[in-house]
Curated annotation (Swiss-Prot):
PANTHER family: CYTOCHROME B. The chain crosses the membrane at residues 34-54, 78-100, 113-133, 179-199, 225-245, 289-309, 324-344, 349-369. Belongs to the cytochrome b family. GO terms for molecular function: metal ion binding; ubiquinol-cytochrome-c reductase activity. It is a multi-pass membrane protein. This is Cytochrome b. It comes from Xenoturbella bocki. The keyword Metal-binding applies. InterPro entries: Cyt_b/b6_C, Cyt_b/b6_C_sf, Cyt_b/b6_N, Cytb/b6-like_sf, Cytochrome_b, Cytochrome_b_C_euk/bac, Cytochrome_b_N_euk/bac, Di-haem_cyt_TM. The main subunits of complex b-c1 are: cytochrome b, cytochrome c1 and the Rieske protein. Binds 2 heme b groups non-covalently. GO terms for biological process: mitochondrial electron transport, ubiquinol to cytochrome c. Heme b b566 binds at residues 98, 197.
Length: 380
């Protein structure tokens, strides 16, 4: 029998091993759909972003008007803009769900894949932050000023780095131009990082809900999981289109409808909702350097999870205490996002400090909880 071309062609062979004949555990659930959904939204962001970049002007006097021009005058410009804006939000929803699944089912034990994933998350956050600055509205300008100014907390060289980032002594034309350039380039870096992420994943094979070695029970990715992924695409695109076409601006900030004005500070400066958990942790420390350390720590602390894992079992499916702690962590994550959007006054300051402490305690107490579960299981 003739060998299919997908198995012999030099390029198609790579795609075949990654998407068609990839051996996959037979019992992976819908929670494993979010990886492919992230690929879908990244592709959509790049396509809509390139179209928007054709009409955007990275000049402080024209950036806000060019966004208005895209929305009003360009054919389907309003659709491209709202798709790009809400696509970023949906990408973060999928990313947090993807990471949550990894934490629940102990996918962090695949150390290389997990650590590359954390790098992808930080790079995605940087890309989204720079994109938020581009409309050059009030929240764009002041968000850029406040967040970049945090770098000045670095001893000795911090202030010089901030001026270097800004391209001057304040956020201005040079800042906008370089942020536009980086925002355009970084998604392609994300594609490369995603390729490395998949490369490491395919070296070890996917994790599964039981946390056991599934080499004896593997099935081809196509057609079993390709159809399953398509169902996930259909469901997520339906929700995405409903929001984009019905409530297109629900995830934006009303303050950003005002052009950037360096002489007028908004009453409450806040980033997009998907950064609010980290912003709340930053604000919970009264010291500037301490806040920056806590912010960076909140993003990189998941990298320690494979070091603190002391359980005999991998997934939390069979660890009831860890399950309770994990879902409390999820609730805490949502609470931190709420606090990040609240004004800096009591009781929000105190609540932010409590929730920030609980966020870090989830990671720090993991080995003790694992050992407690081990003792309880051995007693039985």
């Amino acid at each position: 029998m003739k060998t299919p071309i997908r198995k012999t062609h030099p390029v198609m062979k790579i795609a075949n091993t990654a998407l068609v004949d990839l051996p996959s555990p037979s019992n992976i659930s819908t929670w494993w759909n979010f990886g492919s959904l992230l690929g879908l939204f990244l592709t959509m962001q790049i396509i809509t972003g390139i179209i928007l970049a054709m009409h955007y002007t990275s000049e402080v006097d024209m950036a806000f008007d060019s966004i208005s021009h895209i929305t009003r005058n360009v054919n389907y410009g309003w659709l491209m803009r709202t798709m790009h804006m809400n696509g970023a939000a949906f990408m973060f929803i999928c990313m947090y769900a993807h990471m949550g699944r990894g934490m629940y089912y102990s996918s962090y034990m695949l150390a290389e894949t997990w650590n590359i994933g954390i790098i992808i998350m930080i790079a995605t956050m940087a890309t989204a932050f720079m994109g938020y600055v581009l409309p050059w509205g009030q929240m764009s300008f002041w968000g850029a000023t406040v967040i970049t100014n945090l770098v000045s907390a670095i001893p000795y060289i911090g202030t010089d780095i901030v001026y270097w980032l800004w391209g001057g002594f304040s956020v201005g034309k040079a800042t906008l131009s370089r942020f536009f350039a980086f925002h355009f380039v970084l998604p392609f870096v994300l594609i490369a990082l995603s390729g490395v992420h998949l490369l490491f994943l395919h070296q070890t094979g996917s994790n599964n809900p039981l946390g056991l070695n599934s080499n004896l029970d593997k099935i081809p990715f196509h057609s079993f999981f390709s159809w399953k992924d398509l169902l996930g695409f259909a469901x997520m695109i339906l929700i995405f289109c409903t929001i984009t076409l019905t409530f297109p601006l629900i995830m934006g900030d009303p303050e950003n409808f005002n052009p950037a004005n360096p002489l007028s500070t908004p009453p409450h400066i806040q980033p997009e909702w998907y950064f609010l958990f980290a912003y709340a942790i930053l604000r919970s420390i009264p010291n500037k350097l301490g806040g920056v350390v806590a912010l960076v720590g909140s993003l990189i602390i998941p990298a320690t999870m494979m070091l603190t894992h002391k359980s005999m079992l991998q997934p939390m499916s069979f660890r009831p205490i860890s399950q309770v702690i994990f879902w409390l962590f999820c609730a805490n994550f949502i609470a931190l996002s709420w606090i990040g959007a609240a004004p800096v006054e009591d009781p929000y300051i105190t609540l932010g400090q409590v929730f920030s402490m609980l966020y870090f305690l989830f990671f720090l107490t993991a080995p003790m909880i694992n050992m407690l579960e081990k003792k309880l299981s051995l007693k039985q």
